[in-house]
A protein has these predicted regions:
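Conserved P-loop NTPase/AAA+ ATPase motor core
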Residues: 1-105
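Conserved small/polar residues in nucleotide/adenosyl-binding loops
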Residues: 108-114
């Protein structure tokens, strides 16, 4: 099943909408395309762990994820949540009918005082 979700690529004070397309089919591979950096490519392991801890099962399907536009570099772990939600929706574990109406943004800051 093909589903779309939306995130944002933040560059300075501006942001570009990133369309995340997830397709689950039979197979066991995981592909992530659309100019992701190392942290985004490593999201696979973080997402599997987070879904298991949350009581979901990571689909044992071939998962292809396209992050568009392809010419904008996607950096950091802020895409983990929209990727995880897209994977669950494509695997029909979540209702995808309203997914296209929202942008899923995750921002983490660490400003712990020393």
């Amino acid at each position: 099943m093909l589903v779309k979700s939306y995130a944002a690529a933040v560059q300075g004070i501006s942001a570009t909408v990133v369309t995340i397309e997830v397709n689950c089919t039979k197979g066991i591979q995981f592909f992530l395309v659309g100019l992701p950096d190392v942290a985004v490519r490593e999201s696979h392991e973080r997402i599997i762990s987070a879904l298991q801890v949350s009581g979901y099962k990571f689909p044992r399907n071939r998962i292809v994820i396209n992050m568009a536009p392809a010419d904008i570099r996607k950096e950091g772990s802020s895409y983990d949540l929209p990727l995880a939600i897209g994977i669950l929706a494509a695997a029909e574990e979540l209702d995808a009918s309203r997914l296209g109406h929202y942008m899923i943004c995750l921002l983490y800051t660490s400003d712990a005082a020393d």
